[in-house]
Amino acid sequence: MIRVGDLVKYAQENNLPAIAITDHGVMYSAVEFYELAEHAGINPLIGCEFYVNSGDIHVKDSANNPLYHLILIAKDNKGYKNLIKLVSTAWCEGFYYKPRINFELLKEYHEGLICASACLGGEVLQHLLKNEYDQAKEVAKRYQDLFGDDYYIELQDHNMDEQKRTNPDLMKIAK
C-alpha cells in the first residue's frame, strides 16, 4: 500500500496530470490527498472502492449476500456528495463485517459518479472466474445502463493467472 505523499510524489516525478485514490469502504485519506495533489498541481480524483451486495443491506447474512468490489470516483461536487452519502450509509446502515451498499442505493446516488468494474473482487470478474460469461455481461450492462458513458471495465495485469484468463473476456464485454 502506498502512502498519500508518496503517491503524489510519484505522480509529480512521472508528469501525471491526474491521480485517483480509492480507499476500501472509506474516504479517510481524501482531504490529505486532495490538498497534497492540488498543491503539486495534479488533478485529484476522489473515490472509494465499495463493497456491494445484491440484497438488502440491512440483512445480516453473508452466505446469501456475497460482497463484490466496485470503484466509484467523483467527477464533480454532486458526485463527491453522493460518495459521502454512500460511504455514510454503508457504515451506518449496511455494516456487517464490512460497510456495504447495494444497487438500489447506487440508483439513488449515482449522479456525478464514474464507475469502474474493479479488481478480481468485482462482480463482473467473479462471474468470469466461475466461467459465467453471460452473467458477467448482464452485470456490466446493468451498470452501463445506470452510469452510461461513465461506466468502465477495469483491466489489470499484475501477472496473475486469474487476470490473464479473464482479461480477454473483459475486453469483449467492454466492446
Q: Which residue ranges define each predicted feature?
A:
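Phosphodiester-processing cores and adjacent nucleic acid-binding clamps
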Residues: 1-175
